[in-house]
């Protein structure tokens, strides 16, 4: 789950570090965890092996939001609907430039951002976004 862009958790969620099973964090866990929460907290989570409850995961920044278990399906649908309303090309470019920014300098990332920005201004979605803003209505993006 650490590799997900957004993580919604129910208040019944928990995580047990892999060290409790005699293995290392797999699926990029050893690469991601220190980048997400810092070296010392990552060592605490990965090495002490304490079970983390939903509120612990939220406090550490490993999940975006915790909702009551009975509200989880509705909250998940709302997030999906909110994401679906966004401009898909801009969503892809945002994710790409944010990921690049993790491993590049500020100047290199700024170059990538401006290239993406320029490319997006030539799309139908950009024109739709501007028109919707001017007309004070919700945009209807097509991913073009």
Model-based region annotation:
Residues 2-91, 122-123, 128-131, 137, ...:
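Crotonase-fold acyl-CoA enzyme core
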Residues 45-46, 97, 101, 116-121:
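Helix-loop "lid/cap" segments that line or gate small-molecule binding pockets
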Residues 100-101, 136-140:
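A short structural micro-motif
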């Amino acid at each position: 789950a650490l590799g997900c862009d957004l993580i919604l958790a129910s208040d019944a969620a928990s995580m047990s570090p892999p060290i409790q099973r005699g293995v290392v964090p797999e699926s990029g866990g050893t690469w991601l965890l220190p980048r997400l929460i810092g070296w010392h907290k990552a060592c605490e989570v990965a090495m002490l092996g304490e079970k983390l409850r939903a509120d612990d995961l939220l406090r550490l920044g490993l999940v975006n939001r915790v909702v009551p278990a009975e509200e989880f399906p509705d909250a998940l649908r709302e997030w999906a609907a909110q994401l679906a309303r966004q401009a898909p090309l801009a969503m892809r470019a945002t994710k790409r430039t944010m990921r690049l920014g993790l491993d590049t300098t500020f100047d290199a990332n700024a170059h990538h951002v401006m290239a993406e920005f320029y490319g997006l201004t030539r799309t139908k979605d950009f024109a739709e976004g501007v028109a919707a803003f001017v007309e004070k209505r919700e945009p209807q993006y097509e991913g073009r």
